[in-house]
Every structure is written in C-alpha cells, then in structure tokens.
C-alpha cells in the first residue's frame, strides 16, 4: 500500500489524483491532504478518503471545516505551516505537489527535505527555484516524477535512449483558444473566452496561462531543470489536436513521441505507479480516428509570453521567479476585469526589467524577488488602469 500526501486536493489535478486513488484503493491511500478555500468539496473528500492530517488556507477556514466534519478524528491545520506539515507527513512515501502558483514551492521543499518522492504538478517550484530544488532532491535521493502531460511524455521518451545521445526536447502546445487570432482580435477577448480551452479541463489560472502561451513558457523553464537541458535545446511547437504530448529528438535524427488522449489521469497514474503502469480503463486513442496531426511554429509576436519565458531563463538569477510572480498578479487582474488580455505580457515584461537582481542559489533572494515583483505589478496596475 503506497501512502500519499496530496497538496492542492480540490484543484483540477488534485481531483484527478483522487480519481486514480479511488479506482485503485487497494494500492494507494491518502494519508494527508491540503486545500485552499473550497471547503465544501474538501469536506466531502476528507469524508471519503479519511486522511490523518489536513490543512486549509487559514484559521477561519479551519474552523469552518471542523464544523462541517463533526466527528473527524484527524488533525486540522492551516496556512503555509499546515501545507508544509502535510507535504512532509511521516507515513507518506510520495507527495503530490498540485498547489497552483508560487505557494507550492515551500511545501515541495519541505517534502524533499523529509525524503519524500515528489509527483510534481506545480511547475512554479522549478520555475522559481529549479537549481535549489534539483540539488536538494539529489542530496536527499528523492525522485521528481513529472505529472504535467508534456513533461511526463518527455520523461517516458527519454527511456528510449541514452542521455548522451539527446539532441533536443520538443514541447507541444495546444495553442489555447486563441490560436491564429490577430493582435486586434486578442485585444478584445474576455476572461470567459480565455477560460474556454478547446482540449483540456483546467483551473482558471492555468487556463489563462494556456491562452497567453505563458503556461508553455513556464514549462520550458521547468523542463530545463527537470531534464538538465539548455534553452537552445528546447523547442516549442503548436499542436492543436493535443494528441502528441511531447517529443524527444536524438542525435541520429530519431524522434520519440508519447501519444494519448487528453486525460490527466494518465500521467498522474504513471507518476504514482512508476516504473509500472496502471490499467486505468479510460478512453484510449484510436489512431484511425486521427485525421491529421498538425505541428506549427508558435506566433511569438502576438503571444510574447513564450519568448519572455525563454529570455528569463537565459538571464537566470531571479528573473524566472520575477516572471512567474508578475504573471500571477497580472492573470488575477485580467480575471477580475481590471486589465485586458494583451496587458498581461506587457506587465510581466515591465516588472522583470526592473526587479532587483538576486542569486538563484539563495532561497531568500528568490522569495524576495517574488514579493517585490508582486508589489511592482500591483502598483503598475493601480497606476495604469
């Protein structure tokens, strides 16, 4: 029986993790769970999976949860400290890091320090502090198993050859709901339109990132650290069908790809069962139903978030952390109707250009850049809009 700590239980990834655990309850048990504000759903999850420890956003939500649960015999915590305790829960052998955003960094580090293998869905952990995270994981001897469909695809394709023979990795992007739109059209899009992803069911923040291509930019940075490749050896192509989840190219010209339906339970199950595979029984890909597979160069002029991420990666230091923080604030402002779609990338650019320099080897510098970037972006929104 593999015991699991789950961070971000009520989100899109978290609910999919629980779907897999529910199906294979003879092999997996949830022993600790953390969530944010969705107390109704979290209470139902706790009643079903009976964890020993849970954590929520703050003390007020903890009291609400206690009232909802009544006879719950486990421990209820809250805040960052609660998330970190869930992440490092002693009896868990793997921690699934599925909190959205920078909030996932410190709990993931806590899990690593506690010697837990990590099922990594929180890409911001490596975007912000990739060097620190990878060094600590190596020191502790823990496995970082990708849960993102693209990074899971690369992880699987890398088993087909030797790392010394790797030429490049190719990340596929759906292109989001606005693929092919002009700048004039993008200037008019609404949050509701941006949230309507054509292929995947995702949370609100990730859906907007997919629409701007920032999600793919963050995945580029994640891939650099996870697979130890340089930016010039990472390529992004738009693949509207979302069937080829990513590819690896070797020096002999071979391209190894992982294909499948758009179902997050597949990479989640692989991370939980690695190196084995689980018979999910979900819908499978029928190759004869694939009329065509398109691969297109990204439109980096109308979707500048992708080259912004590459540039932040090349700059190094705290630039990726600043990029991520500014984007989180800008996306929230767009969802609240305070700024327009095209303003997101502009705000990120302006913030990254002025944030104080810092050392990527120092966690305090990274966290300081995160705080400063958020404040700068908020000020710009207040002043300009």
From Swiss-Prot:
GO terms for biological process: isopentenyl diphosphate biosynthetic process, methylerythritol 4-phosphate pathway involved in terpenoid biosynthetic process. 1-deoxy-D-xylulose 5-phosphate binds at residues 123, 149-150, 174, 197, 210, 215-216, 219. NADPH binds at residues 10-13, 36-38, 122, 124, 203. The keyword Transcription regulation does not apply. Keywords: Isoprene biosynthesis, Manganese, Metal-binding, NADP, Oxidoreductase. Its cofactor is Mg(2+); Mn(2+). One of its GO terms (molecular function) is 1-deoxy-D-xylulose-5-phosphate reductoisomerase activity. Mn(2+) binds at residues 148, 150, 219. Its EC number is 1.1.1.267. Gene3D superfamilies: 1.10.1740.10, NAD(P)-binding Rossmann-like Domain. It catalyses: 2-C-methyl-D-erythritol 4-phosphate + NADP(+) = 1-deoxy-D-xylulose 5-phosphate + NADPH + H(+). Pathway: Isoprenoid biosynthesis; isopentenyl diphosphate biosynthesis via DXP pathway; isopentenyl diphosphate from 1-deoxy-D-xylulose 5-phosphate: step 1/6. Catalyzes the NADPH-dependent rearrangement and reduction of 1-deoxy-D-xylulose-5-phosphate (DXP) to 2-C-methyl-D-erythritol 4-phosphate (MEP). Belongs to the DXR family. This is 1-deoxy-D-xylulose 5-phosphate reductoisomerase. It comes from Desulfotalea psychrophila (strain LSv54 / DSM 12343).
């Amino acid at each position: 029986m593999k015991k699991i700590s789950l961070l971000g239980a009520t989100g899109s990834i978290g609910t999919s993790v629980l779907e897999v655990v529910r199906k294979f309850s003879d092999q997996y048990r949830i022993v600790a769970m953390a969530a944010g504000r969705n107390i109704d759903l979290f209470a139902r999850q706790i009643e079903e999976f009976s964890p020993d420890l849970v954590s929520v956003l703050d003390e007020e939500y903890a009291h609400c949860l206690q009232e909802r649960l009544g006879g719950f015999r486990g421990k209820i915590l809250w805040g960052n400290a609660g998330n970190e305790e869930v992440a490092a829960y002693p009896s868990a052998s793997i921690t699934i890091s599925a909190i959205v955003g920078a909030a996932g960094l410190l709990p993931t580090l806590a899990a690593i320090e506690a010697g837990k293998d990590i099922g990594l869905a929180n890409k911001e952990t490596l975007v912000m502090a990739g060097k620190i995270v990878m060094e600590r994981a190596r020191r502790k001897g823990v496995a970082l198993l990708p849960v993102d469909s693209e990074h899971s695809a690369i992880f699987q394709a890398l088993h087909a050859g030797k790392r010394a023979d790797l030429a490049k990795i190719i990340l596929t992007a759906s292109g989001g709901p606005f693929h092919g739109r002009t700048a004039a059209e993008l200037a008019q899009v609404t949050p509701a339109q941006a949230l309507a992803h054509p292929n995947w069911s995702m949370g609100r923040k990730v859906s907007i990132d997919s629409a701007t291509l920032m999600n793919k930019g963050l995945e580029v940075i994640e891939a650099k650290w996870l697979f130890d490749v340089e930016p010039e050896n990472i390529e992004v192509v738009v693949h509207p069908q979302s069937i080829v989840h990513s590819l690896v190219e070797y020096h002999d010209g071979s391209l190894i790809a992982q294909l499948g339906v758009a179902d997050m339970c597949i990479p989640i199950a692989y991370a939980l069962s690695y190196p084995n595979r689980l018979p999910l029984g979900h819908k499978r890909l029928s190759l004869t139903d694939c009329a065509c597979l398109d691969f297109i160069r990204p439109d980096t002029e109308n979707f500048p978030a992708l080259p912004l991420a590459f540039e932040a990666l090349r700059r190094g230091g705290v630039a990726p952390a600043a990029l991520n923080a500014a984007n989180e604030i800008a996306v929230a402002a767009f969802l609240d109707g305070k700024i327009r779609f095209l303003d997101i990338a502009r705000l990120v650019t302006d913030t990254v250009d002025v944030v104080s320099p810092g050392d990527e080897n120092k966690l305090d510098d990274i966290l300081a850049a995160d705080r400063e970037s958020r404040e700068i972006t908020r000020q710009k929104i207040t002043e300009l809009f």
